[in-house]
Amino acid sequence: MKTYLAVDIGASSGRHILGWLEDGKLKLKEIYRFKNGAEDQNGRLCWDIDRLESEVIDGIAACETAPESVAVDTWAVDYVLLGKSGERICPAVAYRDSRTETVPDELEKTVPFAWLYGRTGIQMQKFNTVYQLSLIHI
């Protein structure tokens, strides 16, 4: 039987859901769950990427047989910058961190929101990736 694994990592927990077809119907079973949360790292709310990676691997190991594929869903706005060799060059600061409180107003001075919205269709939310990344240049 072919199985497919979905890994959903949210702000407070993560879970692994195994799916398969049985008699033409989709079956789903939660096989692994873990707690999650951003932690203070030098005054910033950050995700513990090493622990999250370990939790994903542990959840895959909880499958009785290797799934045909694995899909991972996380937050839409957070990121980690990587160096040329693939090493992390900054922490994974969480979207809930307060560092972007004033950024939309600052960025609006050089990049109008109407232009951003026209290009992306994304509402102005202070935690959007564009505002996080713009901190590097403001």
Language-model regions: role of each:
Residues 1-90, 118:
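N-terminal glycine/serine-rich phosphate-binding loop of ATP-dependent small-molecule kinases
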Residues 61-136:
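Glycine-rich phosphate-binding/catalytic subdomain of phosphoryl-transfer
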